[in-house]
A protein has these predicted regions:
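Gly/serine-rich nucleotide phosphate-binding loop at the start of the catalytic core
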Residues: 1-81
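Catalytic micro-motifs at enzyme active sites that drive phosphoryl/nucleotidyl and oxygen chemistry
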Residues: 2-4, 147, 154-158, 173-182
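Well-ordered beta-strand positions in beta-sheet-rich domains
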Residues: 11-15, 156, 190
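Generic detection of short hydrophobic beta-strand segments and adjacent strand-loop junctions
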Residues: 12-16, 143-147, 211-213
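Short amphipathic alpha-helical coiled-coil/interface segments
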Residues: 30-33, 83-91, 249-253, 311
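Short coil/turn segments at secondary-structure boundaries
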Residues: 42, 46, 52, 98-110, ...
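Acidic carboxylate diad motif detector
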Residues: 56-165, 300, 304
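Positively charged, helix-rich recognition surfaces that bind polyanionic ligands
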Residues: 166-382
């Protein structure tokens, strides 16, 4: 039986700054993980260049254990094997891309990490100690972290290098809330959300009046970051690409964005719950951030907004509150007129099919219907 059908998986995050007593030890672990990643990748690359085939995890892991490979033995065995599995995943992703892409684009062979770089360290449950109540201790280290989570729900812990700090993520599971799937009928209480630049989220419903979550604070955070990043990059010596000040700037940006996204999502979901909403429809458009062209400045702002993260937060908060999520493809929703009953086609890459619609966009953010009614475009999309 698939356990994922019974559980929702969540994470508890702890930031480890340079001032933490555990920073140096975590930094050393991530450095050793990088060494093992590169050593495993080197072995795989040489095998591939010599034979045209890969060893993959099972074979290469046995060889490293048998030969007492120094980088493998530098970490606990249960940690080392997870690092090697990540090399395996990178190679399999490379092979899958190679098969699926028929556009002439060649995916890059997995590359070595920088010599002075760091890499993720993962501890599975068997490599963690729970002897001291309220704390998790990592195998063969002096690192322990506080947690209110029960041992039974904890799955693994991940140490992730970030810009100027480390992130400890405790991965745990929660039982899924069971609810009967609802069908869209005139009686269904639903809300629909469209994500954007100045308006992070525009929400409409058949229950309540439309509401808008302001996106300008995120634009402000990104503008401050981009402006100061350029200043600090100009001060860097030749062949140096980062500094402690740049890492600190990136850290502050990430924390501010995370805070705003979580608070916005929490506010929205609490409001949906108060209105007893059954279904939330989220607009989606595959590749919208990669292929967008709305001018240099708008491109920079739009791509700098982590919409995917916002959708993830919304999704898990809705799941916990019994609200179903529907994703709706929206490639032509800003051109089609709902009030005029326009058919909404789906964009297919490579096909230049022309479609005719009743209304038209008069300027950025406004739409004129067939009957000359002017509406906010974000609400037309919804």
């Amino acid at each position: 039986m698939n356990n994922s059908k019974k559980w929702n998986y969540r994470r508890q995050s702890i930031v480890i700054k340079r001032s933490s007593p555990f920073y140096k030890e975590i930094d050393n672990l991530c450095f050793k993980s990088k060494n093992l990643f590169n050593a495993t990748l080197y072995d795989e690359r040489q095998t591939y260049f010599d034979t045209g085939k890969f060893k993959f995890y099972n074979k290469i892991n046995k060889e490293f254990v048998k030969n007492n490979q120094p980088d493998y033995r530098a970490l606990p065995a249960k940690v080392s094997k997870l690092t090697q599995m990540k090399v395996d995943q990178a190679i399999k992703s490379f092979l899958a891309l190679k098969k699926s892409l028929n556009t002439g684009f060649k995916p890059h062979f997995p590359r070595y990490l920088k010599k002075d770089g760091r890499f993720v360290v993962e501890y599975e449950k068997g490599a963690l100690s729970f002897k001291k109540k309220g704390f998790i201790r990592f195998s063969k280290t002096n690192i322990y972290i506080p947690t209110k989570l029960e041992k039974s729900v904890i799955q693994r812990v991940r140490l992730t290098p970030r810009a100027g700090y480390y992130l400890i993520e405790v991965l745990y599971r929660k039982p899924k809330i069971k609810y009967n799937k609802k069908k869209l009928t005139p009686q269904t209480r639903f809300a629909s959300i469209d994500l954007g630049l100045n308006n992070l989220a525009t929400v409409t419903s058949n229950v309540f009046e439309p509401l808008i979550i302001n996106g300008k604070p995120i634009k402000s955070i990104n503008q401050y970051y981009n402006k100061n990043l350029k200043k600090k990059q100009k001060l860097l010596p030749i062949n140096q690409y980062t500094s402690n000040k740049i890492k600190q700037l990136s850290y502050k940006r990430e924390m501010k964005l995370n805070d705003y996204l979580h608070k916005s999502a929490k506010f929205l979901v609490n409001y949906l719950v108060s209105q007893t909403i059954d279904i939330l429809v989220i607009g989606t458009n595959k590749g919208w951030k990669q292929n967008i062209n709305i001018g240099k400045r708008n491109n920079q702002n739009f791509v700098g907004i982590p919409f995917y993260k916002f959708k993830q937060i919304l999704t898990y908060l809705c799941e916990e509150n019994g609200i179903e999520i529907y994703e709706q493809e929206e490639s032509y929703t800003s051109k089609a007129s709902f009030l005029d009953g326009d058919f909404i086609p789906t964009y297919v890459q490579g096909k230049n099919t022309k479609h005719t619609f009743s209304g038209s966009r008069t300027c950025r953010g406004l739409y004129k219907t067939k009957n000359k009614k002017t509406l906010t475009l974000m609400l037309m999309v919804l």
